[in-house]
Amino acid sequence: MQNKPARSMILPRMVVTGPGVLEQIPAIIAELDIPERGLIVCDAKTLKIAGNQVIEYLETGGHPMKKVEIIGASIEELEKVESLSHNIDFLVGLGGGRPIDLAKQAGFNKNIPFISIPTAASHDGFGSARASIRRDGRKTSMQAIPPIAVVAD
């Protein structure tokens, strides 16, 4: 029998699901021992649906927050997210695939942990270590990091 090389997978440290769990985000961040300053990545729709509420929960919990509204998951939007991630301790990707992929990739590029808050169950990449970013008009699957936590209300 031939020995095959071992494979490993990095998984989220915490997965929290259920009604009302968004209110628990400050406690989740404390349990994960993440420092205070955050950047939330969302689009205009998810900002209205849950983003403003998440920002309020986090700021009330002692986490100063910045936000960035994105239009798509392109290299240009990734650069926008990364330019706002200076002096940030964690990223939050809130929404469907595009905001989560941008937060995931920015976290990988800048070595910043990110929390995934999916708002659509139809997106399957909310816990993966790959990000789909549009480059030169084509989607490209890029190596990234999985979220430190997934929080799904």
Language model regions located:
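A glycine/threonine-rich phosphate-anchoring loop and its flanking beta-alpha core
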Residues: R13, F108-D153
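Short beta-strand/turn micro-motifs composed of small residues
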Residues: V41-C42, G95, A152
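Residue-level detector of flexible, active-site-proximal loop/helix-junction positions
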Residues: G72-S74, R98, A121
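Basic, gly/Ser/Thr/Pro-rich low-complexity segments located predominantly at protein N termini
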Residues: E23, I100-L102, R130
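Glycine-centered flexibility sites
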Residues: G18, P26, G95-G97, G125
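A short, small-residue-rich loop immediately preceding and capping a beta-strand
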Residues: S85-T119
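Short glycine-/acidic-enriched loop or helix-start segments at secondary-structure transitions
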Residues: A50-N52, L102-K104, F126-G127
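ATP/NTP phosphate-donor binding region
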Residues: M1-F90
